[in-house]
Amino acid sequence: VHFAKTVWDSNTDLEQAAKASIESIKEIIQTRGANHMAALIAEPIQGNGGIITPPAWYFKELKQLLEEHGILLIIDEVQTGFARTGKMFAIEHYDVVPDIMTVAKALGNGMPISAFCTTDEVAKAFTKPSASTLGGNPVSSATALAVLDYIEKYELCETAAHLGEMLKEGLIALQAKYSLIKDVRGIGLMLGAELVKEDGQPASEETDVILEK
């Protein structure tokens, strides 16, 4: 397992950071050798990392790079999936089909369940049955099916896209009034506002106060 180096911070231009990320991955492939790399795992939007939202071109270029070297792309939709960003899965915003996708959390609406999805080509490699201590729970599975029905019936993707646009506009309006808000980023209802003090340092205390209220 190899972790790519962090190429972004709040003072870095996102476009430049995305380009640096691609170059970093190229360097890893060249250094370690593509034959030693089975797959690359990435979030379409970094959640706990700060709602870091790659530019529109990023995942297409990344997928092309990986395909050239026979490396699979695994997209982690555990936080971003199931209508949160205005589409069923966040990777859809980038018009890329990953080889494998992992999902959980919102799939069960509070019930414990996770799953992975693959392309037909990758699925063909899964030729032997596997065992799981807690897998196949019928209650969680029934809940997941109900969640999917609810998302489609009540058009939650469209709702998240619409409400997210309204919320983002409101946050940007607040940013214009208050220097505390350095940046607003994200897609749909997966949004984040970065708060900083006058010296540019993270406004941790102010963030705590806002969260408490």
Question: What are the functions of these language-model segments?
Answer:
Residues 1-213:
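Conserved N-terminal phosphate-binding loop of PLP-dependent enzymes in the Aspartate aminotransferase
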